């Protein structure tokens, strides 16, 4: 395997056995591709903005004299970049400009001619843009639009599974779901009549919709029924026989022909009888009259002479009518063929309960259901029905819907009209009748072939279309009235409805969510999340168990492990590692093609629908070197079931063992040894890990760490290969390799790093370079580590030395005992940044003022403020300290005579304002690391704002000047090379200033041209530099666009350093979570025979019942990895020969059975071996891929190689007594995470505070500074103890006895420690509530 320069720094030993066939795809592609489709002009008009415009335009006026046509659109440039938008609280968006054409027609009697054409570009609002990392910046906060898994448009056949009716009868239904438009449902009732519902309104007999489609009774019966023809010959009734129709019936007479009896009376007709009738070619049989009576006639029989209807279709035959028909010469009678087995009389029965008898009455009936209370007119009823399913404006099945519709009805063609037609409705009714008759099956709603993914682009397009439709109405009216000659397209369009619809979607839709930015994994998982909730989806309350459950089609598409616990379980899922969506929005997963037992490298992506037709082998099936299956019988999946198949029957094979899990679950080592519930918790808790100050890669990983770190966008990744030319904490400069340079460019890439910024979860985002000067790097190499990454690998926690043993009850109930050394070494220390803002508004009484002149505040409180009233950077503040001094004018109050006198003498006006300063919230303390001031246009900037502006300008100028110098020096290197080739002395050149170099006289024409070219390049560079500085200067100095009524906003950023402490929550990666119970001194911790103490003591009882054995294997393998690292460290310290070091590390990498990883250290230079050894001395990092990890014997090999007992258990000594513990203890290294559930954020105490308005009881919760509720059960406890006075105190003065608590306060002030309980306020509330019911209660004192 070839390693790049940076990969050689630390190689992860891989225990994977299966060869890597397919690289992990870019993990954010679902977001980026979808949005790209939305904003990129699509010439076919199928997707994005183009599709939205084409579906609404052209807009015609009501009179048809004019129309507004769409030509094209373009997106403008963004005003601010991503970082500026975040700082200013702006939306990162671009203006949408659309070219429209207004065409005015001249109407003659015969034809319309074009009178005038006007074309103009029209502004249509702002479209939020996606950042490179798949997020949106909306009002300064980073948000993610989660993809939605919804029911695909099309037709679905389902049943109620016998739950609706008390008899338990299964009622079938069909539903046609369009992409937009009215739903059409068909359903059976318990009496087997078929009904139709439009948009879930009142049900109507299905015949009504058939009549509305212009079918009469006779035609309806013709469509849905087969006919029996009875002929009257010689006063006998003869049935034209179709033998198959007799199956299952009991003969009510002898079936005979030509004297031969084929079936005796009373016998059941079997397949044998039918075959006999067929063999003897019997076409007709004579039947008794009783057999025809009660049959239903399939057409109208009319007396030709009088025109009188003797019997109408769908009526039962009686003896009299039979006689009548015979008299009038009708010798052939058609009846409906029905039976109870597989030809039910459902439509015929339904026609009987239908009151309508022609098209008009059916349309009126539909109109009454859809628009109750409105008078139906012929035109209105026809329009309504036409618009429901047959108008492209109101109804759209979409290409996906049509494809699913046609597939469901087993049609060959998958394309067609996007509206419904007569045949569609009739075919659906036929299929549901077939299902009721026992032919065909109902669909599985939870099959991923019936659910599709709607991503950002598609949802944004739908919202945009809604906005356009709102505009369309207004445009139609404007086109129909007034003088069009004077109007331009600009005057027609109002952009507000469009931008409002888009803004509403991105700002407040259920699927546009505040990004979870705890760590890189939580970001990536959030972007890959798939939700069944949201607009057009399910609701938590109504979602049943089936929808939430794992379905066989989830395999390789949706992760069966990662889903939240609680009410959303199963409704919010995560995309599997290799899954992607196809053009129709269905999820597909890759498989390797297999032919006759030979596995090829060819890869096909299959959707859930396609997968059902194939036999698919698992990824861990044994294959020989040539690619053939070694076993004759192979475990495979087929139609959702697992079983053994012959190797030659197999069609496909899984690509990888981690194909079925999501990114989060693929980071858990040994999940094959964990219970599923615990793996779920492990996957979820990794997302809550807080980035630590010192990052530490996991010793035991899965090989996915690098992919997550690189794709998440938190690291700086090289765009092109080159050499590191300059590196410091805030920027990295790369000199690009010549072969990757564009023509006429300086060949320099500059990467500016993010320093100490706040994330959405108040954690700290900080990038640190991980390359050194002069290092060669390749495209895709990691240059700088972000939060929770270590040398380009995801590092969410720390490798801790753990022991599984009880320790004085401090690990009871999953508690965790931690060594003081962990705190001293800052292993779990994290930085949290909080943003506090102070807004100065213009009030009715005057403007609020930010100043340090605050009434009734002592000098000490103002000591950290500058003269503008704003805290200085670097100040250490605690709860209650003033950060920004602000005073608000208050209304004139009635003054007492004394105050009036004082006013008159001293002219004091200070009491006109009240203190409304920004203070540090309770329980928060930290250091001020940044202050930002935003001032409205036209408001004078204060001194501090100008200072900040100055500082920003200086910094930007310095940055840009440095950038310019880097580019310039690269240019002059080129020029120098040219001069050297002309034998010009470089010493002379160095004495000249740079600008003069271009004026050196050169004789050779080609070289002269080259120098001129470079001179031009230098000039362009300088111009661009000046332009950049000017743009930045304007952005900084211009006033800010603030909300109405806001004059100034001051934002203060506080950084808090939090060490780990008792009460903090910690967890491993296997769902093994707990709370720290005690930080124990190092000397008291258990230690081994070498005197090394353990860092953490965990409870061994937490393992067996939870069945997460993965943590034990991780601990053992971690111990081996660390042991090997210790040996390498020892070799480095004793300065062993490099050749010996190389041999030892090579041996370590070669350990294990038939590994796919082949590391050849002979290709490494001595320097590279030393650097590798230094990075391995803390433990050799190991990768054990999901479901393909290290085996038990391999772990033992590793332990043996490290010189450790293969049991993984060692003798420990008690730190306090020095005595041996009585048995060996499992000790090893486990990767532990500190979760974002810190005791500092949870701990809270109340003395006095605010009270609820109605009940006068203290509020609850930390945010309201509330108290602890003393509830019903707590009252019982005090009653049980007989503590009557304490109880009285709790229920009165400490709760809601208003007078009592005021008196008590006064008593305490006076030093009199007594209380007088009175009536609790809640009792008065109860009295008032009872009185509101009309019952009067009065309290009488005895």
From Swiss-Prot:
Keywords for this protein: DNA-directed RNA polymerase, Nucleotidyltransferase, Transcription, Transferase
EC number(s) per entry: 2.7.7.6
Gene Ontology molecular functions: DNA binding; DNA-directed RNA polymerase activity; ribonucleoside binding
Lineage of source species: Bacteria, Pseudomonadati, Pseudomonadota, Gammaproteobacteria, Enterobacterales
InterPro entries associated with the record: DNA-dir_RNA_pol_bsu_ext_1_sf, DNA-dir_RNA_pol_bsu_external_1, DNA-dir_RNA_pol_su2, DNA-dir_RNAP_su2_dom, DNA-dir_RNAP_su2_hyb_sf, RNA_pol_bsu_bac, RNA_pol_bsu_CS, RNA_pol_bsu_protrusion
Protein task: DNA-dependent RNA polymerase catalyzes the transcription of DNA into RNA using the four ribonucleoside triphosphates as substrates.
PROSITE patterns reported for this sequence: RNA_POL_BETA
Top-level EC class as recorded in UniProt: transferase
Subunit structure of this chain's protein: The RNAP catalytic core consists of 2 alpha, 1 beta, 1 beta' and 1 omega subunit. When a sigma factor is associated with the core the holoenzyme is formed, which can initiate transcription.
Record bears the keyword 4Fe-4S: no
Key word Oxidoreductase present: no
Protein name as catalogued: DNA-directed RNA polymerase subunit beta
Family: Belongs to the RNA polymerase beta chain family.
Catalytic activity: RNA(n) + a ribonucleoside 5'-triphosphate = RNA(n+1) + diphosphate
GO CC, any one term: DNA-directed RNA polymerase complex
GO BP: DNA-templated transcription
């Amino acid at each position: 395997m070839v390693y790049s320069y940076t990969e050689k720094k630390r190689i992860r030993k891989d225990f994977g056995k299966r060869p890597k066939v397919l690289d992990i795809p870019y993990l954010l592609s679902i977001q980026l591709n979808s949005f790209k489709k939305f904003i990129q002009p699509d010439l076919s008009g199928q997707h994005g903005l183009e599709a939205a415009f084409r579906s609404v335009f052209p807009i015609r006026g009501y009179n048809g004299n004019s129309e507004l046509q769409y030509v094209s659109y373009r997106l403008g440039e963004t005003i601010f970049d991503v970082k500026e938008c975040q700082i200013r609280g702006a939306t990162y968006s671009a203006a949408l400009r659309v070219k429209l054409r207004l065409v005015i027609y001249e109407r003659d009697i015969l034809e319309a001619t074009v009178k005038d054409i006007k074309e103009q570009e029209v502004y249509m609002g702002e479209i939020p843009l996606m950042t490179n990392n798949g997020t949106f910046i909306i009002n300064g906060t980073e948000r993610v639009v989660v993809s939605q898994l919804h029911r695909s448009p099309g037709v679905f056949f389902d049943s109620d599974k016998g739950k609706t009716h008390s008899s338990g009868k299964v009622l079938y239904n069909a539903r046609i779901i369009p992409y937009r438009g009215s739903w059409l449902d068909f359903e059976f009732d318990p009496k087997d009549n078929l009904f139709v519902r439009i948009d879930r309104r009142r049900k109507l007999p299905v015949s009504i919709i058939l009549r509305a489609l212009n079918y009469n009774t006779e035609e309806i019966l013709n469509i849905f029924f087969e006919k029996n023809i009875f002929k009257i010959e010689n006063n006998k009734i003869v049935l034209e026989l179709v033998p198959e129709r007799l199956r299952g019936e009991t003969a009510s007479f002898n079936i005979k022909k030509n004297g031969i009896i084929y079936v005796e009376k009373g016998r059941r007709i079997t397949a044998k009888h039918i075959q006999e009738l067929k063999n003897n070619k019997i076409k007709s049989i004579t039947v008794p009259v009783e057999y025809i009576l009660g049959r239903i006639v399939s057409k109208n029989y009319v007396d030709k002479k009088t025109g009188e209807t003797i019997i109408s279709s769908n009526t039962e035959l009686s003896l009299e009518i039979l006689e009548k028909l015979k008299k009038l010469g009708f010798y052939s009678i058609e009846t409906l063929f029905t039976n109870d087995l597989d030809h039910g009389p459902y439509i015929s029965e339904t026609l009987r309960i239908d009151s309508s008898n022609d098209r008009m009455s059916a349309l009126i009936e539909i109109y009454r259901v859809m628009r109750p209370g409105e008078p139906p007119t012929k035109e209105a009823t026809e329009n309504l029905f036409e618009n429901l399913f047959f108008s492209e404006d109101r109804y759209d099945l979409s290409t996906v819907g049509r494809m699913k519709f046609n597939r469901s009805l087993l049609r060959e063609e998958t394309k067609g009209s996007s509206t419904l037609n007569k045949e569609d409705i009739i075919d659906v009714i036929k299929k549901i009748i077939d299902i009721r008759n026992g032919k065909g099956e109902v669909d599985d709603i939870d099959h991923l072939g019936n659910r599709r993914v709607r991503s950002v682009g598609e949802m944004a397009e739908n919202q945009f279309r809604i906005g356009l439709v709102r505009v369309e109405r207004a445009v139609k009216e404007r086109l129909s009235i007034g003088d069009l000659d004077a109007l331009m397209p600009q005057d027609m369009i109002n952009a507000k409805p469009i931008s409002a619809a888009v803004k509403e979607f991105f700002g407040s839709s259920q699927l546009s969510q505040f990004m979870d930015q705890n760590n890189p994994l939580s970001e990536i998982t959030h972007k890959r999340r798939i939700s069944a909730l949201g607009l057009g989806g399910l609701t938590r309350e109504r979602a049943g168990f089936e929808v939430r459950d794992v379905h066989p089609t989830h395999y390789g598409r949706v992760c069966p492990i990662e889903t939240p616990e609680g009410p959303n379980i199963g409704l919010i899922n995560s995309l599997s590692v290799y899954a992607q969506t196809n053009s129709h929005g269905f999820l597909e997963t890759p498989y390797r093609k297999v032919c006759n037992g030979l596995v090829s490298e060819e890869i096909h992506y299959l959707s859930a629908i396609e997968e059902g037709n194939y036999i698919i082998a698992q990824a861990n099936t044994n294959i020989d070197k040539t690619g053939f299956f070694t076993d004759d019988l192979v475990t495979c999946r087929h139609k959702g079931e697992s079983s053994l198949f012959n190797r030659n029957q197999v069609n496909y094979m899984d690509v990888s063992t981690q194909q079925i899990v999501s990114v989060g679950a693929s980071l858990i080592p040994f999940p094959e040894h964990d219970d599923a519930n615990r793996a779920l918790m492990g996957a979820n808790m990794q997302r809550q890990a807080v980035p630590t100050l010192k990052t530490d890669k996991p010793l035991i990983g899965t090989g996915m760490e690098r992919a997550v770190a690189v794709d998440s966008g938190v690291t700086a990744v090289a765009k092109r290969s080159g050499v590191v030319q300059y590196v410091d904490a805030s920027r990295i400069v790369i000199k690009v390799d010549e072969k990757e340079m564009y023509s006429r460019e300086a060949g320099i890439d500059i990467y500016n790093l993010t320093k100490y910024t706040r994330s959405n979860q108040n954690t700290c985002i900080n990038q640190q370079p991980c390359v050194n000067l002069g290092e060669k790097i390749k495209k895709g190499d990691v240059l700088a580590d972000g939060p929770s990454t270590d040398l380009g690998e995801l590092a969410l926690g720390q490798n801790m030395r753990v022991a599984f043993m009880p320790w004085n009850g401090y690990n009871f109930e999953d508690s965790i005992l931690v060594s003081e050394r962990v705190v001293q070494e800052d292993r779990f220390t994290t930085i949290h940044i909080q943003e506090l803002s102070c807004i100065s508004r213009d009030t009715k009484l005057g403007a609020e003022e930010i100043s340090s002149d605050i009434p009734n505040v002592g000098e000490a409180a103002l000591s950290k403020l500058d003269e503008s009233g704003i805290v200085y950077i670097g100040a250490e503040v605690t709860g209650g300290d003033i950060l920004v001094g602000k005073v608000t004018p208050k209304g004139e109050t009635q003054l007492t005579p004394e105050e009036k006198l004082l006013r008159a003498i001293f002219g004091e006006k200070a009491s006109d304002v009240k203190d409304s300063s920004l203070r540090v919230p309770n329980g928060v303390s930290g250091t001020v690391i940044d202050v930002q001031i935003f001032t409205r246009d036209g408001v004078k900037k204060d001194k501090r704002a100008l200072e900040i502006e100055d500082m920003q300008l200086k910094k930007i100028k310095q940055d840009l000047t440095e950038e310019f110098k880097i580019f310039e020096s690269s240019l002059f290197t080129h020029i120098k090379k040219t001069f050297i080739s002309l034998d010009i002395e470089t010493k002379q050149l160095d004495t000249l200033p740079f600008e003069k170099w271009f004026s050196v006289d050169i004789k050779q024409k080609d070289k002269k041209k080259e120098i001129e070219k470079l001179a031009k390049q230098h000039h362009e560079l300088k111009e661009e530099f000046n332009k950049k500085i000017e743009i930045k200067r304007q952005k900084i100095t211009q006033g800010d666009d603030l909300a109405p009524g806001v004059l100034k906003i001051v934002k203060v950023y506080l950084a808090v350093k939090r060490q780990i402490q008792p009460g903090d929550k910690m967890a491993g990666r296997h769902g093994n979570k707990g709370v720290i119970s005690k930080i124990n001194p190092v000397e008291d911790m258990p230690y081994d025979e070498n005197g090394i103490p353990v860092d953490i003591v965990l409870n061994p009882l937490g393992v067996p019942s939870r069945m997460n054995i993965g943590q034990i294997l991780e601990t053992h393998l971690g111990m081996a990895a660390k042991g090997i690292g210790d040996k390498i460290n020892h070799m480095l310290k004793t300065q062993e020969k490099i050749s010996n070091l190389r041999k030892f590390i090579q041996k370590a990498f070669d350990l294990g059975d038939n590994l796919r990883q082949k590391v050849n250290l002979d290709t490494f230079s001595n320097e590279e071996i030393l650097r590798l050894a230094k990075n391995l001395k803390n433990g050799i990092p190991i990768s054990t891929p999901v479901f393909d990890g290290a085996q038990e014997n391999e772990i033992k090999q590793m332990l043996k190689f490290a010189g450790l007992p293969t049991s993984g258990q060692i003798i420990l000594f008690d730190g306090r007594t020095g005595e041996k513990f009585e048995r060996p203890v499992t000790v090893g290294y486990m990767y532990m995470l500190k979760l974002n559930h810190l005791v500092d954020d949870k701990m809270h105490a109340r003395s006095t505070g605010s009270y609820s308005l109605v009940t006068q009881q203290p509020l609850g919760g930390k945010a309201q500074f509330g108290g602890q509720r003393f509830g019903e059960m707590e009252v019982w406890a005090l009653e049980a103890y007989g503590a009557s006075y304490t109880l009285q105190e709790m229920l009165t003065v400490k709760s809601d006895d208003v007078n009592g608590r005021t008196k008590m306060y006064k008593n305490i002030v006076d030093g009199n420690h007594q209380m007088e309980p009175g009536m609790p306020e809640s009792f008065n509330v109860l009295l008032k509530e009872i009185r509101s019911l009309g019952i009067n209660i009065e309290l009488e004192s005895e």
